[in-house]
Amino acid sequence: MRVGLISDLHIDINKDYPIVELTAEVAAEQRTDVLVIAGDISETQAQTLQAIDKLQSLCEFPVYYVPGNHDMWNKNCPECTTEEIDCIYREDLRCLSGKQVILGKDGRQLALVG
């Protein structure tokens, strides 16, 4: 099983670059079976979740993520606690925080644990 692993997309800071599209393109070129993003997608939950939605729509393989420190902040809601923000992410099935996913290919299994 080919696992693609990337982190620190920072789509808000890098808004002038097609990072989501390029990530999907490179992962497909590498014949990725599953893509894992190891944090720091954006500094707002809405942008992070939109990016994951878009990335999944461009990929023919599952996309999972674990929020990083930047994903756990919210510039638009300074009074939001990390516990509240974490609850938002944990509702998303693609978020690995506190979860595990078992994937299989060719009779072999891989556990992704967040």
Language-model regions: role of each:
Residues 52, 81-82:
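Amphipathic alpha-helical segments in well-structured domains
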Residues 9-11, 71, 82-114:
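Conserved catalytic scaffold of divalent metal-dependent phosphoesterases
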Residues 36, 64-66, 96, 113:
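Hydrophobic/aromatic beta-strand patches that form the interior of the parallel beta-sheet core
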Residues 1-64, 72-75:
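N-terminal active-site segment of His-dependent metallophosphoesterases
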